[in-house]
Curated annotation (Swiss-Prot):
Gene Ontology molecular function: any one: DNA binding
DNA-binding region: 201-220
Family of the protein in this entry: Belongs to the SfsA family.
Signal peptide location: none
Keyword DNA-binding in annotation: yes
Function as written in the Swiss-Prot or TrEMBL entry: Binds to DNA non-specifically. Could be a regulatory factor involved in maltose metabolism.
Record keywords: DNA-binding
Pfam family, one: SfsA
Protein name per its UniProtKB record: Sugar fermentation stimulation protein A
Length: 234
């Protein structure tokens, strides 16, 4: 998936109030960007990092610029806009770039399901096959090439795992899909040191038939695509 129009370059001054970030452009202008990420963004928002932002043509937006990518001072590319996780996953499924999720004839988004009335990110269907329910999570937390999720305690994420276990118990296919949007990550684990309950539920979910997939995106200032399956350790 290519960025169109092309992203613009800046240097991060600070992120604040969760949804805002101040940057300085190469020609010395200071801008305030919308930050589309509610997480802790650990390691993704260090002052002095190079950032890339998009600009909306919607004149009604208070902050028309959106923070899309960070390039850390170590050189790693990180996609901080969490909306891209679902976009890239959908593109990869439709292109059959994810072998485990190929062979379906229908893809639906945001389908209500489960006792807790969640909305599943994607549901795949095909004749003579169980429906496949897919919950997508964006992974940007990295420590020494190890990717982790979540980067903060997530009761919502815990709820999603419970719902997926119920789906699997009903004989349908249930998948938790970790879209790794950090170029330095080479393997994935749940962040037990941050949210022990989530890590426990993920292990329980696997035991109850929920499939766990982690795929890494190739990221550049020109575009992104999910390409590579990563090993998962619980």
């Amino acid at each position: 998936m290519e960025f169109s129009p092309p992203l613009q370059l800046a240097t991060l001054i600070q992120r604040y109030k969760r949804f805002l970030a101040d940057v300085i452009t190469p020609d010395g202008r200071e801008l305030t960007l919308h930050c589309p990420n509610t997480g802790a963004m650990t390691g993704c928002a260090t002052p002095g990092d190079t950032v890339w932002y998009s600009t909306s043509d919607n004149t009604k937006r208070k902050y028309p610029h959106t923070w899309e990518l960070t390039q850390s001072q170590s050189g790693a590319f990180i996609c901080v806009n969490t909306l891209w996780a679902n976009r890239l996953t959908k593109e990869a499924i439709l292109n059959e770039s994810i072998s485990e999720l190929s062979g379906y004839s229908s893809l639906k988004s945001e389908v209500k399901y489960g006792a807790e009335r969640s909305r599943i990110d994607f549901m795949l269907q095909a004749d003579s096959r169980p429906d496949c329910y897919i919950e997508v999570k964006s992974v940007t937390l990295a420590e020494n090439e190890q990717g982790y999720f979540p980067d903060a305690v997530t009761e919502r994420g815990q709820k999603h795992l419970r719902e997926l276990m119920s789906v699997a118990a009903e004989g349908q296919r249930a998948v938790i899909f970790f879209a790794v949007l950090h170029s330095a990550i080479t393997r994935f684990s749940p962040a037990r040191h941050i949210d022990e309950k989530y890590a426990q539920l993920l292990s329980e979910a696997q035991q109850r038939g929920v499939e766990i997939l982690a795929y890494k995106a190739e990221i550049s200032a020109e575009g992104m695509a999910l390409k590579k399956s990563l090993p998962v350790t619980l």
